Amino acid sequence: MTNLRKSHPILKIINSSLVDLPVPVSISSWWNFGSLLMACLAVQILTGLFLAMHYTSDTATAFNSVTHICRDVNYGWIIRYLHANGASMFFICLYLHIGRGLYYGSYLYSETWNIGILLLFATMATAFMGYVLPWGQMSFWGATVITNLLSAIPYVGTDLVQWIWGGFSVDKATLTRFFAFHFLLPFIIAALAMVHLLFLHETGSNNPTGIPSDTDMIPFHPYHTIKDILGLMLMLSVLSALVLFSPDLLGDPDNYTPANPLNTPPHIKPEWYFLFAYAILRSIPNKLGGVLALVLSILVLAVIPFLHTSKQRSMMFRPLSQCLFWILTSDLLILTWIGGQPVEHPYIIIGQVASIMYFTIILIIMPLTSLLENHLLKW
């Protein structure tokens, strides 16, 4: 008699995805982040569900309802901080996952890569709307500034902004709809993640060498489940330390002041995980140009498969490309730092140089370096 997990209509799908899935023997811990992201999403949905039971999406009571969760609800403070810092862990895993894809050439699985870009956009939208919900100063002004960027779209911009706001400013209607979408989007992200996984399992995983490994596979369970559980334990340890020792480390103190439309904070900035894109937006003095640069800073990932000029898939044996990859990583860290600084000299010029470097490395220098490496290897 066949094993139930191989014959049951539902269990056999789970079995082929998580138990008997053939996986390259050489994949490293950099391949853990997919499962970590699913764990982060599960944590976010669960904590978010419990927060939504006590939260009220009304401008008059939203701030007080968050205070009530932290002070009066049993373990409300830990649920709230798990949710807030869980988002930071989500983005850390997300950026490392994308970085691994870039380094090892996983972007050549174009369907999986493009679904991944959609997932990134959906996650960023969810995080932005979630940041608005506590209705503190930075929530209100962040929502005002970021939604206002859409007014740069010719002809329809102003109407579009007022349509999103549900009025002539960020108000009750805006908060209510942001709460509705913030609740809905994680489930759309979960569905997209399933599609992402579906396309990945059509081709099988890439590996650090970038060489097809059809002849050298091992089952996902128990080998990679153990490895993934180790990664999960490490991530949960970091998240627990963050939540229990310094829960406000990554937040903004301005968000502990209730939203006041008559008082603008001295420095409006988003959460740390958007600062690199915010720095690119601010580095262009023109509004429409800034918005286009902001969108392209993420959308540039979609053209990377077309710019792959190397004869090798992975960067494992390409030292020049490796140097460029780490320069790009440093550039992103500089942009993140600049995004959190005030708009004054010398931060403006540093941001502009770093923004130009970001696009130049990805669109011009990396493809040319790959061609040079091909030539050096006489390919």
From Swiss-Prot:
Changing I211V: In strain: Isolate CN 97682. The keyword Transmembrane applies. One of its GO terms (molecular function) is metal ion binding. Binds 2 heme b groups non-covalently. Heme b b566 binds at H97, H196. The chain crosses the membrane at residues 33-53, 77-98, 113-133, 178-198, 226-246, 288-308, 320-340, 347-367. Heme b b562 binds at H83, H182. A ubiquinone binds at H201. Heme 1 (or BL or b562) is low-potential and absorbs at about 562 nm, and heme 2 (or BH or b566) is high-potential and absorbs at about 566 nm. Belongs to the cytochrome b family. Component of the ubiquinol-cytochrome c reductase complex (complex III or cytochrome b-c1 complex) that is part of the mitochondrial respiratory chain. The b-c1 complex mediates electron transfer from ubiquinol to cytochrome c. Contributes to the generation of a proton gradient across the mitochondrial membrane that is then used for ATP synthesis. This is Cytochrome b. It comes from Noctilio leporinus (Greater bulldog bat). The gene is MT-CYB.
